[in-house]
Amino acid sequence: MSEQAPAPKRGRRFKEQTPVQRALGLLVRREHSKKELNRKLQARGIEPEAAQAAVERLAGEGWQDDVRFAASVVRNRASSGYGPLHIRAELGTHGLDSDAVSAAMATFEGDWTENALDLIRRRFGEDGPVDLAQRRKAADLLARRGFDGNSIRLATRFDLED
């Protein structure tokens, strides 16, 4: 047997991506806020000015939208059992202003008290908390999840006839 030289590798050559391409790659996976996208680009070694320009370009072309991002966060967190206080705080960490946060919270079409009741039913069964200790645990759970006092009070009272 004769030895042959290994065939040259035929693969894709790596081309350096532009800041816009890097940002678009992040946006394809999931929505990002402008602040979050800018921070991620800078963490990947892109100059702050180039990162900001890329984010602004994608926002101008409709690829990035803070309102759409915020509405998506509200929808996802509400369906995961989080309350309005938690969601507002999370949106604030993404660098959204109070107007965008309020607009996103207004897109929620459900009832926060009903969401709290659903969460309690999932954790404590259909009958809900039966004694005072379980009611306290349920109230603590709802408070940790970011529900307001009124929703907690109504959800932990748990009168099925009401």
From Swiss-Prot:
Alphabetical keyword list: Cytoplasm
Compartments it resides in: Cytoplasm
GO biological process: regulation of DNA repair
Keyword Cell membrane: no
Any one Pfam family match given in the protein's UniProt record, by short name: RecX_HTH1
Classification via Gene3D superfamilies: Winged helix-like DNA-binding domain superfamily/Winged helix DNA-binding domain
Cellular component, GO annotation: cytoplasm
PANTHER family: REGULATORY PROTEIN RECX FAMILY PROTEIN (PTHR33602:SF1)
Function: Modulates RecA activity.
Family stated for the protein in its record: Belongs to the RecX family.
Stated name of the protein: Regulatory protein RecX
Natural source organism: Xanthomonas campestris pv. campestris (strain ATCC 33913 / DSM 3586 / NCPPB 528 / LMG 568 / P 25)
